[in-house]
């Protein structure tokens, strides 16, 4: 391809599935690698001489180097020049990322500081009651209420809503993001484009989780979502954490001292694949590990719990009729 800028863009598309619309050589670009609003996980820089560039995705952990010519055709000097440019770009990217992480940490620390512990009858406890957790008290302490959290869709503020807020925490105890579930005052899901959202990260998210409970007697369970993890805990008594997505379930780093792992998998392709990946890692580390999956395709354990909670009420109505 004669146009090196277009060739670089084509390589980014092939590697990430997304690319910036405009690439200006010599400048760092951030761009979306998903359909999520405000996603800037992708990054790239084409060098001024147009002979090379770097690109990747912070969320996926991808870091690639591109050369306009086949590496085997480069002279030793050209290889040295490319390596020098890659090193300079890497240093610049890492500095930018550290600053972005620091900015994100400051923003979500402010949000967390505005949250309050749950009390019966607040929007979060009403929401969880609707999800089948009525009568469960105390609820996990990491779940908090924000009384009026702004909701942004792109650059548009759609309003403020009560929200269930939970920290995403690394194995060494660092909070790297906040998970938010937007609600109404009576505990319904808010009428917003995405009810559940993650803040910008303050560090790598891979392997982190929402620590609803700590391990007990060397045993811990994990599920994708908060409600799914809580359903697994309520049904089995196994203390659970939430991975917040299938990809992070597969990459989860269990705490030191864990000897038995229970995976409450979602009954879909992504859920099964993530559970299988985590189980393979756990077994390789000589942990006891079992995967529990709902029998209904597409269901998760929160769905199973909700259906079980509805069954007695339906039976009572039939008896009254």
Could you describe each region identified by the protein language model?
Residues 152-256:
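Phosphate-handling DNA/RNA-contact segment within nucleic-acid enzymes
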Residues 134-159:
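Short, basic/aromatic recognition patches
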């Amino acid at each position: 391809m004669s146009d090196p800028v277009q060739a670089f863009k084509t390589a980014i598309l092939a590697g990430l599935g997304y690319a910036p619309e405009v690439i200006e050589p010599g400048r760092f670009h951030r761009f979306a690698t998903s359909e999520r609003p405000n996603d800037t996980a992708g990054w790239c820089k084409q060098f001024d001489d147009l002979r090379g560039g770097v690109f990747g995705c912070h969320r996926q952990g991808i870091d690639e180097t591109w050369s306009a010519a086949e590496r085997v055709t480069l002279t030793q000097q050209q290889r040295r020049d490319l390596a020098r440019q890659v090193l300079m770009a890497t240093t610049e990217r890492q500095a930018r990322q550290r600053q972005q992480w620091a900015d994100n940490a400051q923003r979500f620390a402010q949000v967390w500081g505005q949250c309050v512990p749950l009390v019966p009858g607040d929007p979060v406890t009403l929401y969880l009651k609707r999800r089948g957790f009525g009568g469960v008290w105390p609820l996990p302490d990491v779940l908090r209420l924000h009384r009026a959290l702004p909701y942004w869709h792109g650059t548009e503020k759609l309003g403020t809503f009560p929200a269930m807020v939970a920290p995403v925490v690394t194995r060494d105890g660092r909070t790297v993001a906040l998970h938010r579930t937007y609600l109404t005052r009576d505990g319904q899901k808010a009428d917003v484009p995405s009810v559940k959202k993650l803040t910008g990260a303050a560090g790598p998210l891979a392997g982190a989780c929402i620590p609803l409970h700590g391990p007990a007697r060397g045993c811990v369970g994990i599920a994708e979502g908060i409600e799914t993890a809580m359903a697994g805990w309520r049904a089995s008594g196994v203390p659970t954490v939430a991975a917040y997505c299938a990809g992070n379930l597969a990459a989860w780093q269990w705490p030191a001292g864990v000897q038995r792992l229970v995976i409450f998998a979602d009954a879909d392709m992504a859920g099964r694949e993530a559970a299988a990946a985590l189980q393979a890692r756990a077994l390789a580390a000589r942990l006891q590990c079992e995967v529990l999956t709902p029998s209904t395709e597409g269901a998760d354990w929160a769905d199973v719990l909700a259906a079980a909670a509805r069954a007695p009420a339906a039976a009572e109505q039939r008896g009254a009729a």
